[in-house]
Regions:
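Non-transmembrane functional regions of envelope-associated proteins
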Residues: 2-3, 7-206, 240-321, 326, ...
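Intrinsic disorder/low-complexity detector
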Residues: 4, 217, 390-393
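A diffuse structural propensity rather than consistent per-protein peaks
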Residues: 80, 229, 358-359
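Substrate-access "cap/lid" subdomains that shape
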Residues: 202-236
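Alpha-helical transmembrane segments forming the membrane-embedded cores
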Residues: 311-394
């Protein structure tokens, strides 16, 4: 038994796995130093996360959960400020737990009646907690922070004190995919908080998230958020009472953002973010050092399986198995099955813990095993040649 174990874990398999992980690291370093020939690969990896596959798998299920804490009210076709003020008051009358208004009322309009009606609503006609939207602007690359903010006219022009949260959507650098949302950002010498963070804290009373996180990785669960038309609020009082209610444009094509679930409205991204914070389901990735350690272990195991099965096939008495072993088809099949099993395990672990392992590097390492074997054979032969030369001289 000891001999078999020693044979299975022979140093050459360890060396092949080590070469594969080194090749993987070299590619990663190529990304970091922006080597031009690796640009296409870099872009592909930058716009890819294993969690995208997990979210897609979850949302393929026919049975989806209906949110019991968040309701959307669609105001896509409402542009009149007086009518918007009425909608806000109607929502307030249904006794929501807290409201989020995903609208920035930019500047005074010629419609003075609409302006005054909205100001009256903001100052006197709302009894429920409300968080109003605003935008952070003028990003300073040198200071790595926003330097200004753009508020609704009743804050900018009249200085009315309201609870606000920024709604800047956060995209990946190249891909433009929205995978996270800011919790807080530094502006001047103080922190500004996002509307999802303020809504979540307003609902739960727990402000831990404000201190613990700068960003919230969004958990795109298989959830349906009830959506009410702006003119059907009273008929859907049960979907508003005690809920977080987000008023915004759910079907405005100008406010669509690309996410792991495809293009969805900005207000729906806010809903997913609030749900993630409230349910404490913020996805986390394994630490980098742990990821690289387990990547090596997984690559080593893959090499042991590939080498062991290929060797057995080549020694088989059956012609077909012998031929399969000769053409190294076993190694390719084992690699595919191994990757599928690894991704499946990662998915199961993520669904149950909200922690995910970046299997992309393992997949790359396993794909490089054949190349690593050839490099190892080349190094071994070169060493043997030099070693034989020394022996002959002696």
């Amino acid at each position: 038994m000891d001999d078999k174990f020693h044979s299975a874990c022979h140093l050459e398999h360890f060396a092949v796995a080590l070469i594969a992980i080194v090749l993987t690291w070299l590619i990663v370093l190529g990304f970091l130093f922006s080597l031009s020939f690796l640009n296409p690969v870099e872009r592909a990896f930058e716009n890819f996360r294993m969690t995208d596959i997990f979210y897609d798998a979850e949302n393929q299920e026919e049975q989806k959960d209906t949110s019991g804490i968040i309701t959307l009210v669609d105001m896509t076709d409402v542009f009149n400020r007086s009518r918007l003020a009425e909608v806000i008051e109607e929502i307030d009358a249904m006794d929501p737990a807290i409201m989020g208004i995903d609208i920035v009322f930019d500047g005074l309009r010629d419609d003075e009646v609409g302006n005054e009606r909205l100001i009256e609503t903001v100052c006197n006609n709302i009894h429920s907690p409300v968080i109003w939207a605003y935008k952070l602007t003028d990003w300073s690359e040198e200071e790595r922070r926003f330097t200004k903010a753009f508020h609704s006219f009743f804050v900018e022009e009249y200085g009315i004190d309201v609870e606000e949260g920024y709604t800047n959507v956060q995209r990946d650098v190249n891909g433009g995919t929205v995978r996270s949302f800011g919790i807080k950002r530094k502006v001047q010498n103080h922190f500004e908080y996002s509307i999802p963070a303020r809504l979540a804290v307003g609902l739960t009373g727990d402000s831990t998230v404000l201190k613990k996180y700068d960003d919230c990785t969004i958990r795109y669960t298989a959830t349906v958020f009830p959506t009410i038309p702006f003119d059907s609020i009273a008929q859907n009082a049960d979907l508003i009472r005690g809920h977080v209610v987000l008023l915004g444009a759910t079907s405005d094509k100008r406010d669509l953002h690309y996410t792991p679930l495809g293009h969805i409205a900005g207000v729906k991204i806010l809903a997913y973010t609030v749900q993630t914070i409230v349910n404490r389901e913020i996805p986390r990735e394994f630490p980098k050092w742990m990821t690289m350690f387990f990547t090596f272990i997984f690559i080593w195991i893959a090499e042991l399986f590939q080498a062991g099965l290929t060797s057995r096939m080549k020694k088989s008495r059956f012609w077909i198995f012998h031929k399969v072993g000769e053409y190294d088809l076993v190694a390719e099949v084992v690699a595919i099955i191994y990757i599928v099993l690894l991704v499946g395990f990662d998915y199961y672990f993520f669904v149950n813990t909200n922690i995910y392992f970046n299997t992309a590097w393992t997949i790359m390492g396993v794909a490089l095993l054949e190349t690593s074997c050839k490099i190892y054979a080349l190094l071994r032969d070169a060493y043997n040649v030099q070693h034989n030369k020394k022996n002959n001289k002696q």
